[in-house]
Amino acid sequence: MTVYKGIYTVGITGASGAQYGIRLVQEMKKKGYKVHLVITEAGWQVFREELLIQTDDRKMVIDELFAAGDGEVSFHQLDDYTAPIASGSYQNRGMIIIPCSMGTLSGIAQGASGNLLERTADVMLKEKRRLVIVPRETPLNQIHLENMLKLSKMGVTILPAMPGFYQLPKTMDDLIDFVVGKALDQLGIEHELFTRWGEERDNHSR
């Protein structure tokens, strides 16, 4: 039987920024974690637009994106309420939705459980397990902010997709890695995706 470092759920929605979720899952699998992956229909549409994917074979896309690493990625259909992550008895260490659309955010805040993604988030709340939401929207209206505040009061971590620049990023990957690294920090997973403030930076000075 394979022993994993931990088990987490990752949700990817239709907010722009699919690369955040992809990079996160790749890093978790590389480090030996088991990842339950749920992608909304709008999330798949964003995959096609942002990754220039031409095929409709979703399994092939998942297999190609997450081929490397010692962990495991289990993909679940959005309407599969029989998935283990839909139950509080399953030992799911935590969940992150990256990026998170405002529609999904609203559904979670209202306890809608309208699909597997929302149901799993609801399980995290009722079991008082770690739930991290990475919103990717701008500007924000009052409803968005109130939903974030409501979830924050329940113990949810709201981690906006806002990259830092003190590490002097040179590429788009550097910006993506900063946000993904922050997300991994919240999940308690060690990484080397960016240089932390105060650490030596390649011959740069402030």
Swiss-Prot record:
<comment type="similarity">
    <text>Belongs to the UbiX/PAD1 family.</text>
</comment>
<keyword id="KW-0288">FMN</keyword>
<feature type="binding site">
    <location>
        <position position="136"/>
    </location>
    <ligand>
        <name>FMN</name>
    </ligand>
</feature>
<dbReference type="InterPro" id="IPR004507">
    <property type="entry name" value="UbiX-like"/>
</dbReference>
<feature type="binding site">
    <location>
        <begin position="14"/>
        <end position="16"/>
    </location>
    <ligand>
        <name>FMN</name>
    </ligand>
</feature>
<dbReference type="InterPro" id="IPR003382">
    <property type="entry name" value="Flavoprotein"/>
</dbReference>
<feature type="binding site">
    <location>
        <position position="182"/>
    </location>
    <ligand>
        <name>dimethylallyl phosphate</name>
    </ligand>
</feature>
<protein>
    <recommendedName>
        <fullName>Flavin prenyltransferase UbiX</fullName>
        <ecNumber>2.5.1.129</ecNumber>
    </recommendedName>
</protein>
<dbReference type="GO" id="GO:0016831">
    <property type="term" value="F:carboxy-lyase activity"/>
</dbReference>
<feature type="binding site">
    <location>
        <position position="166"/>
    </location>
    <ligand>
        <name>dimethylallyl phosphate</name>
    </ligand>
</feature>
<feature type="binding site">
    <location>
        <begin position="101"/>
        <end position="104"/>
    </location>
    <ligand>
        <name>FMN</name>
    </ligand>
</feature>
<dbReference type="InterPro" id="IPR036551">
    <property type="entry name" value="Flavin_trans-like"/>
</dbReference>
<keyword id="KW-0808">Transferase</keyword>
<keyword id="KW-0637">Prenyltransferase</keyword>
<comment type="function">
    <text>Flavin prenyltransferase that catalyzes the synthesis of the prenylated FMN cofactor (prenyl-FMN) for 4-hydroxy-3-polyprenylbenzoic acid decarboxylase UbiD. The prenyltransferase is metal-independent and links a dimethylallyl moiety from dimethylallyl monophosphate (DMAP) to the flavin N5 and C6 atoms of FMN.</text>
</comment>
<dbReference type="GO" id="GO:0106141">
    <property type="term" value="F:flavin prenyltransferase activity"/>
</dbReference>
<feature type="binding site">
    <location>
        <position position="40"/>
    </location>
    <ligand>
        <name>FMN</name>
    </ligand>
</feature>
<keyword id="KW-0285">Flavoprotein</keyword>
<dbReference type="Pfam" id="PF02441">
    <property type="entry name" value="Flavoprotein"/>
</dbReference>
